C-alpha cells in the first residue's frame, strides 16, 4: 500500500489517503486534495511525483500556488536536451539548434502534441548524431497541452521565498 499525507508547516497531519501500492502519487492526489480543499490551502508543496501537467493546471486554476521541485530531464544523456529546442508559441512549432522548424502533426490521446522535423533536411544536419537515433532521420518532439502550467510552476519555484517554503515539505 501507499500512504499520502498532507501536513501543515508545523508537521501536523491535515489529511491522508491510503492507496494500493501500484498507484502513482499523481493518481492518488485527487482523493487527498478532496480532504484538503475545505481547509482552503494557499500553497501546495509536494515532491516530484506530483510535478505533472494535470496537477499543475488543477492547482493554478484553483488559484493555489504549487511549490514543486526541479526534475531532471529524462532521456538519453548523449542527445540534445529539451531546453536546446525552442517552442515558438506564435507559429506553434519547435525550433532546433540548426534553426529548422519541427511542425505540428497530431495530438495524442494523452494530451501530447507531436512536432516532427523534415527528414530530408535532417539527413544532412551536422547535429544529426546528437539529435535523433531514428532510422529515417526524423526528430519527434512532444509537448503536453498543459506544458505552460508546468512552466508557471518552474517560475514560481524561482520566486523569492519558495526555496525556503519547499524545505518545509
Go through each PLM region and give its residues:
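Anion-binding and metal-coordination hotspots
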Residues: 1-169
Amino acid at each position: 500500500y501507499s500512504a499520502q499525507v498532507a501536513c501543515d508547516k508545523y508537521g501536523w497531519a491535515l489529511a491522508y489517503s491510503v492507496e494500493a501500492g501500484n498507484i502513482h502519487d499523481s493518481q492518488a492526489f485527487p482523493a487527498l486534495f478532496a480532504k484538503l480543499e475545505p481547509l482552503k490551502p494557499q500553497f501546495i508543496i509536494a515532491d516530484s511525483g506530483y510535478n505533472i501537467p494535470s496537477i499543475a493546471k488543477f492547482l493554478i486554476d484553483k488559484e493555489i500556488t504549487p511549490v514543486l521541485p526541479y526534475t531532471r530531464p529524462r532521456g538519453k544523456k548523449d542527445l540534445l536536451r529539451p531546453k536546446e529546442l525552442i517552442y515558438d508559441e506564435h507559429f506553434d512549432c519547435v525550433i532546433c539548434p540548426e534553426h529548422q522548424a519541427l511542425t505540428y502533426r497530431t495530438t495524442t490521446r494523452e494530451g501530447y502534441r507531436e512536432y516532427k522535423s523534415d527528414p530530408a533536411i535532417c539527413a544532412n544536419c551536422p547535429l544529426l548524431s546528437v539529435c535523433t537515433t531514428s532510422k529515417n532521420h526524423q526528430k519527434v518532439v512532444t509537448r503536453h497541452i498543459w506544458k505552460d502550467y508546468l512552466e508557471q510552476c518552474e517560475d514560481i519555484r524561482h520566486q523569492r521565498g519558495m526555496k525556503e517554503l519547499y524545505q518545509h515539505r
